[in-house]
């Protein structure tokens, strides 16, 4: 290809000149062995090794053309090529178009300018013609992409993210090479002294990813799969490489978890011209995602918020009159600040609250200041901004985008997390400054609605205010303490600001740890969790969602109804319909908002507590924050997030409570207790008034509080737990301890806890103060950091998801092993292949939506499903009958048979049932499967199925199916037509796909699970008609085409075919013939007599068989009211018959025009003439009204040939089986055992160029070689 001219100083270093003229030189890289160039011996090996180690572009383009003027020492690269043919074309173009022109110039500088301009013009023209879009990738990276695709056979859909120089340890020997990291694969390539090594691992197969340090190797990345371990070292920047590997592995785990694929973000701003382009656009995208994810987690922002940039600055804090050093973060809808010193100060300013952004006057004390004012009259002063003008411009742009919008149905259907809405209104509460939607009928700014006529709406007040009960004897002291807490918070708001824009400091955390006052709890939960932002930007969303979900029922709503009365049953708010109805609405609305989660046990307990302290809509948004941001993946069908944190807790217990860890592991207690603790935030194991204090801390600090508290509980019971003899005793110890945790500041009457109600201990457990327990957890385990938890979560996520996948595989195998003849090992390998094919189609594209093919809520056997395109590839690799061009047709028939529910997808059970019958079934089972595949109706003509008939007639015969009529009589009009050289063709319009699919369902109903016992009886199988029989014969013929005993099998099949044809003809005698109009005039030959010769032509040595069949006609040739018009349309179709003109004859096959022109082709067919044997003549029907006569262009020399199939001809499965048993060769073929593991191994190791038919195996696509 042509390249932008670049200077080259040493033209002959490592290059061999092959052609030269005064201005241009064509060179080949030393050591390149392609195109007969020779390997170059030792020097070639050294150069090849050097190219790999130094990542030279010569590995991709070993040929190049240089430009040089006679008097200059500087060369210019103007073209490069991967083959001699490609570079020669460029060379010839230069000689023909430029060489003569250059001799005209006198000045060498003019020549150089002309050549460079010409080459750049060619490149620009090529890009314009081929619509090549400019991207941010460097030329070097584009070369790496070409290498990656070529070296590993990856399709264009596989995107390379980055590549790094490193060493791979194969045994005890390091191999220096390059690691290529793509979206779905980790690849390594090395070429040293002629020895090549390749490694390809899918991210979804990685079970462990670690960065280790040893004495010999200070920096090693260890990659583990189920079957092997791989070590990489000698990285230039191991931290950057490992972070990217973690990110790509996380994307793969997300794909396994919920089928969430990767889509590149095209909205990233382009790099400035002055910026050095060092990374690919995809790498920039992933880096931006990682930064945005950390940004959202740090400030509790909505899931779709993208970080635009950050800069160092100082913030003036009025509460202590100081300038605090920190970082400002700017995104589409927020300006945030956090101090360099942890927990000193943080700030969140939504742009919807901003009124003024202005540059203040600079001074030596306050350089480059920026003032931001909000609607609640707070002003924030930032200073020491490096690029203040640019920052102000970006904020101004985002402010313009933040326009006022009212929530619409379109947003409801499309995006649930729109974050650029703004509604201006007054704050309606002490704490929250978020806007509320106001209506003329409600002065409080809340929208009242009654969606359930039987329940009182709770949208305007919390359940706690309606069901608040105080104990008179404890009223005064506890209420006084509660009042003091409220006053402390009000003082805090006055000093640090209130609402979303408040300064968050260490003082804020101290107040939270002392307990939030009950009257402020709901609003502070909204504020601290960030749920206030989603509520403010989605006014009316919850009401609309409830209205749309009311009255709809699914599995989630059934589970919700079942658990409603189990939600805090001890609290009076949930002992009547009002509280139950509110809980129902919130849970149902969320199930419809997020169908991937729907409803999970423990959500009802958490939501009921949220409803006690927050209004109904607020409780909904708190639940959204909890499920989607603060506890990710906790509440899905497999509680993956809770299992991940359970593993993290085990690691933390090992580090912080080592003396207890081994004992607890032996008892298995940690995994048992932690799941309920984490899923319900201790609400199900602690007294209610104590557990809500834990929830207070959780909304402020996040999951680290739960880990700290769990470790504190274990630490407080070390001695007792060490003395426990079994898990039951340990559980009792912990249960009693948690039951004794009390909140002495609570103004609520004591609510009996479930555990304490069931306890029969005589000796009460000493009381434990919840505030003291929380303080202890901070003192002993407060060093646990959020980023450390995220690192541990990643490690555990790999382990948990792969363990779940292995469990799923074992369950599937255990369920299906008794239904098939496969071994457990074979089934496990087949399942791995089946799932791999599904996953490959997810990221490389498929003919159906990946989300439709994977539903984790279904039983294990039905979770993964494949469509026909995927099945076709697996059929070709695994099924013993797949052979030749007919393989796709046979795959289509089997897929149609296995797809019992008609959804165009098959699950693993269906797939294995067909494969088991074909590979390990007995003779009768195999033949029954083959018979069933052909007794189904033909697929609709609009399906993209490979044709099984004459290609020459496909153009004419597409939508109208020739219907075989048994000709028993000809009237005078018909005889005249025959004498004139016309051929009778009865045409019946195709009824279309709908009728065909209905017919398919009728056939498939015979083999539904309910009728399996019936289908086992061969007598209940439908009969095979003549057209289906022809297709069955063709299938058998193609099955044997690559068999060593091909000739013997062919003759045996021909004998069976002849026998079955005779059986079918005899069977017709027992079928009552309808009354015919007219006499039994002229007669013709038996319809079947032409079939054997057409299906099984005589074949000479080395000649291929030619098998033809009937093709349907196009809709444009459908019968018209005037017969002669259709005849005119088909005038050019030449049909030939084997019978004499003077006999109305019926034949079974149609021969294309191309074949009739080839004498040798015609002579190879064994065609029986029916006119010479009077005893073989049959009576013919009268020609019907829909009969069309077509003139033959061959005149009297051409023999008319009928395309009709006999509708009365049919055979049964018993006849087919009995006939085949007469041929030992066929019996031996179908009884032959199939080595399944060999086929599976072949399928695992195969690598397809381009879009794969089946992906590579369970684990490595290609093994290390060399």
UniProtKB/Swiss-Prot annotation:
Domain of life where this protein originates: Eukaryota
Function: May act as a GTPase-activating protein for Rab family protein(s).
InterPro entries for this protein: EF-hand-dom_pair, EF_hand_dom, GRAM, PH-like_dom_sf, Rab-GAP-TBC_dom, Rab-GAP_TBC_sf, TCB1D9/TCB1D9B_PH-GRAM1, TCB1D9/TCB1D9B_PH-GRAM2
Domain notes for this protein: The arginine and glutamine fingers are critical for the GTPase-activating mechanism, they pull out Rab's 'switch 2' glutamine and insert in Rab's active site.
Record site feature (Arginine finger), residues: 562
Region called Disordered, residue ranges: 415-456, 1075-1095, 1132-1164
Site positions for Glutamine finger: 601
One function term, GO molecular function aspect: calcium ion binding
Name of this chain's protein: TBC1 domain family member 9
Lineage, top ranks: Eukaryota, Metazoa, Chordata, Craniata, Vertebrata
Claim: Membrane is one of the keywords in the record: no
Residue ranges occupied by any GRAM domain in the UniProt entry: 146-213, 293-361
Pfam families reported in the protein's UniProt record: GRAM, RabGAP-TBC
Keyword Ligase: no
Gene: TBC1D9
Record domain EF-hand: where: 886-921
Keywords tagged on the record: GTPase activation, Repeat
Organism: Homo sapiens
